[in-house]
Amino acid sequence: MQQYFILDGILKRVVSNPAGKEMILRFAAETEIDTSYAAWRLKTTIPYAIRAVTRVRTAELSMEEWVAFVERHPPVKSQFEFEVMKLMSEVMAHTITLHLLDAPGRVARFMRKHAPLVERVPKKELASYLNLSPETLSRLKRRGKIDLQ
């Protein structure tokens, strides 16, 4: 299990069903982290994969090294645990959004929450994150129902 510090590029956290259909849970870019900390603490397997969306440069620590570091630095540990809770809340909010909002609403929420990523995330990945086909995303844009600017 790893602790990732993103220096350049974009990562995604994904889950896949047995047929290989992928659901993107979140994107993370420069200055952000991705982590398997919760699974490590709970002594469970990681229920998701962390993959590159774009060319990525990261700094990584094993979970053992990272936990040893934060144990020696209580303010860092406190901030880190807060960040982990925010990440988990973000994933929950995204999952709820997929169920409660229509396609234009999901796009609008992404634009509001992640505007800097719109031009950087490939449209195929964005469509997948929003639980849309790339064709539907393109059609919504063409018909003026969404604005990806």
Region annotations inferred by a language model:
Residues 1-12, 30-31:
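Glycine- and acidic-residue-biased ligand/ion/polar-headgroup-sensing regions
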Residues 8, 30, 55, 63, ...:
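ATP/adenylate-binding site constellation spanning eukaryotic-like Ser/Thr protein kinases
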Residues 14-20:
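Cytochrome P450 core scaffold surrounding the K-helix E-X-X-R motif
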Residues 24-82:
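Cyclic-nucleotide recognition modules
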Residues 82-83, 90, 107:
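Short Pro-Cys-Gly-centered "Cys-loop" motif that presents a nucleophilic cysteine in a tight turn
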Residues 86-97:
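Short, Lys/Arg-enriched N-terminal segment that forms or immediately precedes the first helix
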Residues 101-149:
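Phosphate-/nucleic-acid-contacting segments
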